[in-house]
Amino acid sequence: QGPDKHEAMNWVKKALRQFDVWKQAGLKPMPALQHALLFGPYMEGLAGAYAAEGLPEFEATLQAVNTVLRDKANLTQIPKAVVFDVERILGIQVQMRKSSGQSKYAARLRHRNGFNEALIYLKLASGVDPARKELLARWIAPAPHHGSEPKAHGSAHENKPRN
C-alpha cells in the first residue's frame, strides 16, 4: 500500500527541498527525521493496511516502521536508534490525531522526546495533504496552562505552624 506515484513524488520533492533549506541554514536534522520525511507516507500507508486487518493504529504504525526500516533485503542497514526514533515520530502522529491538542495529555505529549520532530513531520505532511492542515492548526495553537506553575513561597497554600 502507500500513496500513489504522483503524491509520493510530490512528497519526496518537498522533503528534499526542506533538506536543502536546512542545509543552507546550517542546520542538520536528526537522521530519524530525515528517514521519516523520506519514507513516512509509505510507512503510514502500510500502517493503514495493518490497521485494516485489525491491529490497533499505534501498533500498526510501529509494525510498519519495522517492516520498512528493518527489512533485511535492504542494502543499507539502518541503526536501531534511528528506527526507534522514526517509530517515535510516526507514533506521535497517531497520538496527535487522538488528542485535541489542548488537554493535559497534549501538554505531556508536547514534552515527549521526539515531539518537535513529529511536529516538523506534520507541518511537511500538511503541505502535501490538506486533510492534515486542521490537525497542524490544533497542535501549533498555544497550549493552555493547566496549573503547573510552581507556588510562590509565602503563599496561602504553604503549611503554617499551628499555635
Task: List each language-model region with its residue ranges.
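Catalytic cores of the polymerase beta-like nucleotidyltransferase superfamily
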Residues: 1-163
